[in-house]
Amino acid sequence: YRSIWTPEGSPLMAQSIAQTKALTTSLSSKARVALAMRYGQPSLESVLDELYSQGHRRVLLIPTYPQYAASTTATVTDALSHYLLSRRDQLEVRTIRSFPTEPAYIEALARSIEDTWAERGRPNFAAGDKLIASFHSIPQKMHDQGDPYRSECVATVEALRARLNLSNDELLVTFQSVFGHAEWLGPATIDT
């Protein structure tokens, strides 16, 4: 991790803070924007306590996992439910489940790719170059039990292909970060 750390610290935290500031600016004084972490600080519980103490009673919770998975998004809503069980005067809470094909999300991905192409050159797809969309994998068992994660990852890539005018052979869907001996979603990025 030392090689990816920035002067601001964790890249995830630095990006999350930047997103919070951008959303705060975008919404102006229409809403209070707060950053909460599921596995870190500031914790979801401490942020909800702070919002409550400031008089806020309505919360829109947006987990920053674009594709829903029980192992990610559901843990946020589970933590929220556990928090609400401990309160007598409950907050009114809405959650965003996922946003795999949200136009603004797809546009942000496409612009990031196009910016990279402008800086480093577009791949030579005619010569066999590939663009790989690599998602964190989940155990195959979770998929078999009905977890929609894989289909939402594929939906993201299909929308990105359409936006970038790429074929299935030019923009591939792969999965990474497997561990243990169980079967995981594939194809594996490392084998692609």
Predicted regions and their residues:
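Active-site-proximal alpha-helix that buttresses catalytic centers in soluble enzyme cores
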Residues: Y1-T192
